[in-house]
């Protein structure tokens, strides 16, 4: 029996987003480290706020970073 995902993003969509991130990056190692650092930051933020997130931090980081890549308008002008 197939296990259904609780999220609206499927595993194939996550893989596609990760491939898009890697192909858009000039350095695969650097983008991997950036995703890992963001996931680590999110994990500590969730831990401090006692928020029980259903999505793993790495998956959330991949989704956020790919959204920033495809939708630059969500990143505010600093």
UniProtKB/Swiss-Prot annotation:
BP GO terms, sorted: DNA-templated transcription
Taxonomic superkingdom: Bacteria
Residue ranges that the Swiss-Prot or TrEMBL entry lists as coiled coil: none
UniProt key word Transcription: yes
First-level EC class: transferase
SUPFAM superfamilies: RPB6/omega subunit-like
Keyword Repeat (UniProt): no
Keywords of the record: DNA-directed RNA polymerase, Nucleotidyltransferase, Transcription, Transferase
InterPro entries: DNA-dir_RNA_pol_omega, Pol_omega/Rpo6/RPB6, RPB6/omega-like_sf
Position of the signal peptide: none
GO CC terms: DNA-directed RNA polymerase complex
Pfam families, alphabetized: RNA_pol_Rpb6
An MF annotation (GO) of this entry: DNA binding
Catalytic activity: RNA(n) + a ribonucleoside 5'-triphosphate = RNA(n+1) + diphosphate
Record-listed E.C. numbers: 2.7.7.6
Described purpose of this protein according to its UniProt entry: Promotes RNA polymerase assembly. Latches the N- and C-terminal regions of the beta' subunit thereby facilitating its interaction with the beta and alpha subunits.
Subunit structure as annotated in this protein's UniProt entry: In cyanobacteria the RNAP catalytic core is composed of 2 alpha, 1 beta, 1 beta', 1 gamma and 1 omega subunit. When a sigma factor is associated with the core the holoenzyme is formed, which can initiate transcription.
Family per record: Belongs to the RNA polymerase subunit omega family.
Protein name according to UniProt: DNA-directed RNA polymerase subunit omega
Organism: Trichormus variabilis (strain ATCC 29413 / PCC 7937)
